[in-house]
């Protein structure tokens, strides 16, 4: 029975050594059984001498970065053990060891050197915020990495900007990808970054905030610059004075913003309100804590409200009052306009327009009708019914008679003599002026007599006598000299 591995694994040297020692005596087997029984009773420490007498090989050990099979037990003569290395390492020397007797009769391992696991290749380093280009690195090769955007490569040795793979599988002067280091934060404030992040790429902006009751002193925002330093020093949060309890209000209370009101720090706003049935005496109901004092500093009071809603009857009465007042105002304005108009009319009647009176003798007004000058009546004549329409010295014609000059009028010597005295020229003049006389008689009523009676209508005798007294147009009045009718062309 062997406490080890069976050496039949194809190793010629070990198989040859074992074949020479194949016969085993029964006495040796009994000795091993006896030794185990004594070890259970007295312990292995008291049987050291006996263990040496049994001729077993010492424990070969386990190489660093490796392991062996079997991992434990007692190794007697002809026992075999195997050694293995972890990934990335290789075993230096033989992987098998044989327990065999030397020439002096003692047992030992063949080969006798201790197994060693050496690193075959340099492992890929774990560099934060970097990408490794190659996957395997042999002895003497350089490490090639790319840092993430915003980070820069930094070497421990500033004079040796390269990292090489050593013989033992380790790296020399291993670099890192570095950004701006995490800045300090105030104990009374906070920043908008993760507590596990230690390096920040270029362009990162960190915002500082203070807890309520503290004021920020310094720059509020910090930026990571290209030289991997922050734009300014971290700010501080300084404690502010806390305002006292707001003034209490009878029949009311207050609420604060922001809530809850654990401390009345700088910037806290208090809003007052009254209980139902009460109202504030002032329209302004807010006060603000500013550097330990309330602003504005005034006392707030709540008084009982006495407001009553008007009834329907009172509302209608108020509406009618408004309508009546509006209608009365409109009527009064209209009455004033009418009175002003009447006063203006009477004023014009009593006070005629100013100006010098017209003189009919000095500056007569004439109208020429069919070549005959006709005097226009004055205002008084038109009102009183006067019909003196001819110019001075020309009496009004009656019926179909023609006007005659005053100087030339003479009663006929004999009745009916007007027919014989009238010349042909005078008859034509009478015919031409008869139309204008009829028009004037239609415009003006006949004048009243001095006694108040109308003149008697013209009789045929009168008409015939008047017709005979037709004035000649050639002598008497020079019409062209008195009134220019039309400017003739030369």
From Swiss-Prot:
Residues 42-319 are extracellular. Residues 55-119, 120-179, 178-239, 241-304 form the Sushi domain. Residues 341-490 are cytoplasmic. Disulfide bonds join 57-99, 85-117, 122-165, 147-177, 180-224, 210-237, 243-289, 274-302. It is found in: Membrane. Residues 479-490 have a biased composition (Acidic residues). SMART domains: CCP. PROSITE patterns: SUSHI. CDD domains: CCP. GO terms for cellular component: parallel fiber to Purkinje cell synapse; postsynaptic membrane. The chain crosses the membrane at residues 320-340. Residues 1-41 form the signal peptide. Glycans are attached at residues 104, 134, 192. Acts as a complement inhibitor by disrupting the formation of the classical C3 convertase. Isoform 3 inhibits the classical complement pathway, while membrane-bound isoform 1 inhibits deposition of C3b via both the classical and alternative complement pathways. In contrast some authors report that SUSD4 acts as an activator of the alternative complement pathway, while having no effect on the classical pathway (in vitro). These contradictory results with human may lie in the differences in protein expression, in this study SUSD4 is expressed in bacteria and not in eukaryotic cells. This is Sushi domain-containing protein 4. It comes from Mus musculus (Mouse). The gene is Susd4.
